[in-house]
Amino acid sequence: MTLTSLFSLSAHAEVNVDAAKALAKENGCFRCHGTDKDKDGPAWNKVSAKYKGDAKAIDKLLEHLSSGKNVKFADGHEEAHKILKTEDPKDAKNLVEFILSL
């Protein structure tokens, strides 16, 4: 096991997978995203790969989930990304950490 993989494991050791999936389900995230299969939006394992090694990945994804900025679909149309609804910011961070752990 490499040092990088050890850091990766420790960085995501505290992720509550069940809570992350429940929050995603409550917010309808799985309508557009799969964990390992593209739908209207990219698969989350592809999102994770895109941000691998980016020290600001968590902040960037939290901003994406809270801003409602437009996203472009495969057919070329754009829509505002649904804003993640949660009472506790820690839950949003847990979801992002789950996505990045894939």
Q: Which residues fall in each region the model found?
A:
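Post-signal/leader-peptide non-cytosolic segments of secretory proteins
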Residues: D54-H64
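Electrostatic cytochrome c docking/interface patches
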Residues: S8-A24, K50-K52
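Solvent-exposed loop/turn segments at secondary-structure junctions
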Residues: K37-K39, L102
